[in-house]
């Protein structure tokens, strides 16, 4: 995931600019106003999950295709956060989401009572459109994100928002990725549009061009509305 104009200075293959190696240990930087900033248990799990992403991205593409994504460690409280979100958002989706989203959400069959592991969801998605989901530690450079799309890979976070703010997250989390994106990636036309964005970004040569393309992606595929049966 990335923002509409993330002009970070790291190399474009950097997995996540917020993940640091400190004294040989993986450390996720959180802003002081982040809901989980003072929660040592939450931060420890975030670091462990970030390590999964870093080690995954050290492998070659061929290696990643032949291996399963390691399971992320989730607590009972975090499973409860997922359950609370699903309870609230499911009826909202039934009322407002488009037909294709609802059809593919049913095919995915995301559990209501626990956070699904990225590997199990990715396997189902791959059967639908050939797209796979692979882990990243957090926000990534737009070119990193788009180049993955060209290879039918959607980079996804595995951590979940803090339990003190279950209906808000300051960063894309596993709810955002799996509930927000995966169902639509199961729509063939939508999947191909993502691939085209990725191929277009592979032709960009400047940071300004990358950010302009990222803004188009942000307001077309990340956020947007559609007209269906005469209603928006």
Can you say where each PLM-predicted feature lies in the sequence?
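A contiguous, surface-oriented mixed alpha/beta subdomain in the mid-to-C-terminal portion of proteins
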Residues: 161-232
């Amino acid at each position: 995931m990335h923002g509409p104009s993330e002009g970070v200075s790291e190399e474009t293959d950097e997995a996540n600019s917020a993940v640091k190696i400190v004294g040989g240990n993986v450390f996720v930087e959180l802003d002081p106003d982040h809901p989980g900033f003072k929660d040592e248990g939450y931060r420890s799990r975030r670091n462990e999950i970030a390590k999964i992403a870093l080690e995954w991205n050290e492998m070659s593409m061929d290696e990643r295709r032949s291996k399963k994504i390691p399971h992320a460690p989730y607590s009972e409280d975090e499973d409860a956060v997922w359950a609370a979100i699903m309870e609230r958002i499911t009826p909202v989706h039934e009322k407002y989401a488009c037909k294709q989203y609802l059809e593919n959400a049913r095919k995915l069959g995301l559990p209501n009572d626990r956070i699904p592991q990225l590997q199990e969801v990715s396997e189902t998605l791959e059967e639908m459109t050939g797209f796979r989901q692979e882990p990243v530690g957090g926000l990534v450079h737009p070119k990193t994100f788009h180049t993955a799309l060209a290879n039918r890979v959607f980079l996804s976070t595995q951590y979940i928002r803090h339990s003190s703010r279950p209906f808000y997250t300051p960063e894309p989390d596993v709810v955002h990725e799996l509930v927000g994106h995966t169902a639509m990636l199961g729509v063939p036309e939508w999947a191909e549009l993502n691939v085209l964005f990725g191929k277009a970004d592979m032709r960009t040569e400047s940071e300004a061009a990358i950010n302009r393309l990222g803004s188009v992606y942000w307001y077309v595929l990340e956020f947007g509305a559609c007209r269906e049966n005469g209603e928006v």
